[in-house]
Amino acid sequence: MVIHSGSRNLGKQVAEIYQRRAINLHRGWDEYILRRNEVIKEYKELGKSQEINQVLEKLKEGYGTLDIPEDLCWLYGDALSDYLYDIEICQKYAMRNRKLIASMIMEKASLTEIDSFHTIHNYIDINEMILRKGAIRAVKGEKVLIPMNMKDGSILGIGKGNREWNYSAPHGAGRILSRKQAKEMLDIKEYRKSMEGIYTTSISLDTLDEAPQAYKSVEDIFDVIKETVDVIEVLKPVYNYKEHGDETRNNK
């Protein structure tokens, strides 16, 4: 059983909060708040409370200008430590989510877990301080899963721990069509035909962007992972489920 699920938008929200904090850092806002508190304390002790607002307005003029684009602002100091702490919670939450899904399915289907493992992409390896975007960890001897598409399934492999590849491997097949392009260019009848032999109730307009035709071929994947992963086998799906919206609209 292969389950693909993340933090259910929590990680995105945390990232947006800290990107705003990074922007404020580069505007000097943290420094301004610190100086502001010092001014308030100092003027109150001197009995000059009536002058505080005027002084703060003058102080504020020295902050707020960015010398780099907002999307390139980065975190440092306590803000970085706070972010790493919170994002680790998001990653643990995502892992717990997958475990719970598996547990519920196994209970309903009267199945017993023999073994399990997690392969994570688009995350921060907190222990090694490696950011993996579009990549998974593939240290030597580690069992990994590389998903391809709804039809071809996933590659089960063992990591080689290749230092030249940052102890990583590709996280999946990779797209040849963006989600927008897939929905504009692909035909649902061809999509349905390509899934023949695999039981699924998820072939619909809402999942057209996940059609096998939107991804690179299996052969392309084997060529690029050979330096990072030893392939054990390809796990072919017999059943595939994706959230797919309204049945009435999607099966016209």
Residue ranges, per PLM feature:
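Domain-length cofactor-binding catalytic modules of enzymes
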Residues: 1-252
